[in-house]
Design a protein with these regions (language model features):
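Short beta-strand segments
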Residues: 24-58, 64-66, 72-78, 86-89
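Short, surface-exposed beta-strand-loop junctions and turns on beta-sheet-rich folds
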Residues: 60-62, 81, 142-144
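A generic "binding-loop/recognition-motif" signal
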Residues: 58-59, 131
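Short secondary-structure boundary segments
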Residues: 78-79, 130
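Short, conserved active-site entrance elements at the starts or edges of catalytic domains
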Residues: 3-34
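Charged, gly/pro-rich active-site loop segments
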Residues: 1-12, 84-163
């Protein structure tokens, strides 16, 4: 599901994700290496053109992973050990973005954020086709929400909840 459709389907998780990703400007991106092992990499993220976009250096390992096997996991960066903002976790499929208009919109978004943008065609650009989203917050007010296409957006029993 494209990001703008996910925002409509589950505004609760999407809103927190957008806020966190905008604040942190980087996420942890999990890909699958050629040997099948997981690879975890920091990656800048931007929302533009109705998509959650990840720009990567040309021929980087994580980009090569996604070109070969598009499965990925996105995890918000914990703010502190106690992480009062909670964890946002997204699972889905990477879509290589070749459309010149989408790439231009991404470059405008990143330039507005950090006063720099990669030159064409020297970077990879992927968007996330969201398949599952989870938000967990621990502590005094624990929260557990999940979204997937089959079950929609729902609250779960939190792992810290008293039995």
């Amino acid at each position: 599901m494209r990001w703008d459709d996910f925002e409509a389907a589950c505004p609760r998780i999407a809103g927190i994700a957008r806020e966190r990703f905008g604040q942190d400007e980087v996420v942890m991106l999990g890909t699958v290496r050629t040997d099948g092992a997981p690879r975890l990499s920091p990656c800048e993220v931007d929302v533009a053109a109705g998509r959650l976009l990840f720009g990567m250096m040309w021929q980087s390992r994580k980009a090569q992973d996604l070109l070969r096997d598009p499965r990925l996991v996105v995890h918000s960066v914990p703010q502190t050990r106690m992480n009062p903002g909670g964890d946002v976790k997204l699972r889905g499929i990477a879509i290589e973005e070749r459309d010149p208009d989408v790439r231009a919109t991404y470059r405008e978004a990143i330039r507005a954020r950090i006063d720099w943008a990669p030159d064409e065609p020297g970077f990879h650009l992927f968007s996330l086709d969201v398949r599952e989203a989870i938000y967990l917050r621990f502590g005094e007010e624990p929260v557990a929400w999940r979204w997937d296409d089959a079950g929609g957006c729902r609250e779960l029993r939190h792992p810290d909840a008293a039995t």
